Every structure is written in C-alpha cells, then in structure tokens.
Amino acid sequence: MTGAVSAAYWIAAVAFLVGLGITAALYAKLGESEDRGRLAALAVIPGFAGLAYAGMALGIGTVTVNGAELVGLRYVDWIVTTPLLVGFIGYVAGASRRAIAGVMLADALMIAFGAGAVVTGGTLKWVLFGVSSIFHVTLFAYLYVVFPRAVPDDPMQRGLFSLLKNHVGLLWLAYPFVWLMGPAGIGFTTGVGAALTYAFLDVLAKVPYVYFFYARRQAFTDVVSAATADREDATDAVGDGAPTAAD
C-alpha cells in the first residue's frame, strides 16, 4: 500500500465520522417521529464504513488470492452498507417489505459476485462479472421502475426519494466502470488509481446521502405534526360539542 492510498483511507475514515455525526443530529431532530427508530439504522452506513476504512488504512483484511489482491474490508463494507443505501430509498418511497428486501438482496449479490470475479481468472472471471452485472441491472429496475410506483403524492417525500434515487443511481454507474478499468478487470488503471477512486466514490455516496436525510427531515417530522394537529382538532371538536351546565 502506498502512502497516498493510506492517507486517502484515513481521510475517508474521518469523513465517515462526520457522516456519523450527521445521523446523530438527525436522530435528535426527529423528536417524536414514528420513523425515528428505523432511521437510527442510518448510522450503520457511515459508522461501519469508517471502521472498514480505518482497518484498510492499517492493512487489515487485504489478501492475495490466485495472484490477485483482494481488499477484503472494502467488500465487507460494501456488502453491509450498500444494501442499506438502496433499502432506505425503498423505505422513503413507501415500498413493500418484499420490494425493499428484493433490492437489498440484489445489491448484496452484485457485490458478492463482483468479489468472486476479483479472485478468479479466465472465463470464470467474466462469467462472475456478468452475473454481478445482471444483479446490477435488477437493482436499477427496483430504483427506477418498482419504487416510483409506490411513492405517495407528498411533495417532500417524493422530492427526497427522487434525490436519493438519482444520487445513488448515478454513482452506482461509476463503480463497475472503475472495476472494469482497474487491475481486477482489463488493467487499464493501476491499483493505486482504483483505490483512490473507490475511496472518493464511497465518501461521495454515503456522507451526502445521510445529509440529505437530515436536510429534508421535514418529510418525516411533518407527518407527526399533521397527526398531532388532527388529534388536537378532534379534541377541540369534542370539547365544543360537549353539553354544559347552562345547556
């Protein structure tokens, strides 16, 4: 590992610490929102990624298999955090649990077969890459076909869904290209170049992602405010209609 790669990994770890702080602020701001408990799981995304990058900076989990270097913690990070990224998009869309589980599974299998393609060679490498690509396309079908059908007619919720979907969608187009151009693929770029690009993409994918939830938290708090207002209106109506001694 070069000094540049090690430094990039440490910078990424610090950036994810910032992301963890953002999720803590979001949790505090949500107050009585019924989404508060579920959205607390967002902390896993920057938290786990930060630990993984700290480990990568220390050289933990990097192994050589069949002459190919596999940065194990990178793939462990991806297989834990990226299903959460796409799963929460489905949650914001109001998709069914089955659909959310489907997109998370497609994402995890995409990563798993991609890791398999790194440590194999010849025809098998490209077969595994092809299978990974199929799950990649399946993931996009969920994001751009299945989930939009479930989004309620609420401007804030629809806006947050669109933002998250396009943010992740655009970045997910870059990852297979970097893999293909790097040592695991056709070897057009060096391992250092691929490592630096992956670190940049990971930070760009995850830290702004949790910030978007914080910046648009009204999509969740307004639901609570509306419900509270309805209860207060109902209470007032009962009070106004109740008989008094004068009656």
UniProtKB/Swiss-Prot annotation:
Membrane topology note: Multi-pass membrane protein
Major site of localization recorded for this protein: membrane
Alphabetized CDD domains for the sequence: 7tm_SRI_SRII
Cytoplasmic face residues: 27-35, 94-96, 152-154, 224-247
Positions in the Extracellular compartment: 1-4, 58-71, 120-123, 183-190
PROSITE patterns recorded: BACTERIAL_OPSIN_1 (PS00950), BACTERIAL_OPSIN_RET (PS00327)
Transmembrane regions listed in the UniProt entry: 5-26, 36-57, 72-93, 97-119, 124-151, 155-182, 191-223
Molecular functions (GO terms): monoatomic ion channel activity; photoreceptor activity
Sites of N6-(retinylidene)lysine modification: K206
Subcellular location: Cell membrane
Keywords: Cell membrane, Chromophore, Membrane, Photoreceptor protein, Receptor, Retinal protein, Sensory transduction, Transmembrane, Transmembrane helix
Gene Ontology biological process terms from the UniProt entry: phototransduction
SUPFAM superfamilies for this protein: Family A G protein-coupled receptor-like
Gene Ontology CC: one annotated term: plasma membrane
One Pfam match: Bac_rhodopsin
Protein task: Involved in the control of phototaxis. Mediates both photoattractant (in the orange light) and photophobic (in the near UV light) responses. The signal is then transmitted to the sensory rhodopsin I transducer (HTR-I).
Family to which the UniProt record says this protein belongs: Belongs to the archaeal/bacterial/fungal opsin family.
Subunit structure: Interacts with HTR-I.
Name assigned to this protein: Sensory rhodopsin-1
Organism: Halobacterium sp. (strain SG1)
